Structures are given as structure tokens and as C-alpha cells.
């Protein structure tokens, strides 16, 4: 059997309302006792009974359990718990101080933000048109100076990156031959160096036995002329002068073929002089003399 649904609203009939109160009060006390016993918790009830429609005086409250001491102990315990849980206390003075500090922090943040991202200076409102034009020209000039300074700095950095530092140990004679030996692409001094019409080193290094004395002679010559090595953009080694270019101020005169045969008479270097190195008259004199190449 389905239980009847109770209409939850105040009972208008006084007699029926008082009867319902007595029944439900007994049921409520029974449930409170079961709850306290089964769960092991302290429980108390304070109930104010109903009054008639014409009765203004409120009836005496009813308590459960009937022992008033137990009820007061539970109420006192509740009050103590509530008072200790509210640890944060304040008064009017503290509240006003907290509000003032909060407003001060907000004001500082606003001023800092305005100073950092300022879009207009109030002093400019009092300037004339000529003064504003002068300020505009000054700002434009400062901007151009900054751009020019930045371009110069970039050019200086790029120029320094293109320059190859000069190896200082090349100026020492004991490191100069080793440096030349480690450069396979270096074949010798350039042609016509110091008015000599032939290369000092043959491009075929494997066919000629190098003389250590001759290598030392070339090292001394390079140090005398203040030569240095630099590397090009493609990795090629070039011979360049350290300071002023060297010019041979001797008068250029026609030299005999015998002069160009072997400028280093004390060294055994087997090499021949090709005909294209000599002028026409020198070739004829060489062939008519009947001399043989070394």
C-alpha cells in the first residue's frame, strides 16, 4: 500500500495542529535518542510548542534530554567551539588601516604603469607650436643619430669578422718553415718578386728535393720583406705585406741569361730556365753559345 503524500504546509485547524505536534514530537525524541546511542554523539533538542491563533504568549520550550545540565553542557561546548574558530578578529581602526594600505598599493601600481607607458606629457599642453616643432626636430635628430651609430657598430663588427688575425709565431724563424710546409696550396713567392723572372719553387714539389739551407734562406727573405699570410674568402692563402708595399728602386736593366740561370750559386737545385722566360735576343745568344742547360 502506497503511503499517503503529506501536504507540507501549516495546518490551519488549531486542534489538529496540536494533535499532530504531540505525535511528531514523540517521534522526534525517539529518533534523537536512537541517533545519539547508535552514533555515540552528544545530542540535544530544544522545541517550542505551537500556540493558538488567539494566543500571543509563547509557550515554555521543551528540551531533550530532560536533564537540563546535559543540555547546558552541550550548548556551552558549542559556544566555545564557535568562539575559538573565529581566530581572525578586527575592529574599526584595523579595518580602516587595511583599506588605506590597499588603496595605496593600487595607486602605486597605477602611477608605475603610467610612468612606464606614458603616451603624453602634461607639460606639452603648455608649449606653443614653435616649441612643439623644435621638440619634434630634436627627437628626429636623436633618432637619426641612434640609427647612424647602430649602422657604424654593425659595419665595425662585420669588418672585424672579415679580418683574419695574423699568426704572431710566423715572425719567429723556427716556426716559419713549419707554417709554409703545412700550407699545401702555397707554392712559393709570386712571380717577378724583386725583379726576378722565375718562380723560386716549382709547382711539382714531389720532383725536387728541398734543401734545408735554401728553405732557411727563403725564411730570412720573407722576414726581411715583412711578409705575412692572409686567407681569402674562398680559403686561398695570399702573400701580402704587413705595412708599406716594397718597391725595388734599382734601375731596371737588361740582364744576361747567365745571371738568371741560378741566383743561388751555393745550392744544388736542378732546374731549367724555359725559353719563354727570356727575351728574343737572350734566346739566340743562349743557343749560339752552345751551352747546355743545367
Curated annotation (Swiss-Prot):
GO BP terms, alphabetized: positive regulation of transcription by RNA polymerase II
Localization per record: Nucleus
PROSITE patterns referenced in this protein's UniProt entry, alphabetically: MADS_BOX_2
Coiled-coil region(s): none
UniProtKB keywords: DNA-binding, Nucleus, Transcription, Transcription regulation
Chief location bin: nucleus
Database matches in PANTHER family: SERUM RESPONSE FACTOR HOMOLOG
Subunit field text: Interacts with MEE14/CBP1.
Name under which the protein is recorded: Agamous-like MADS-box protein AGL82
Gene: AGL82
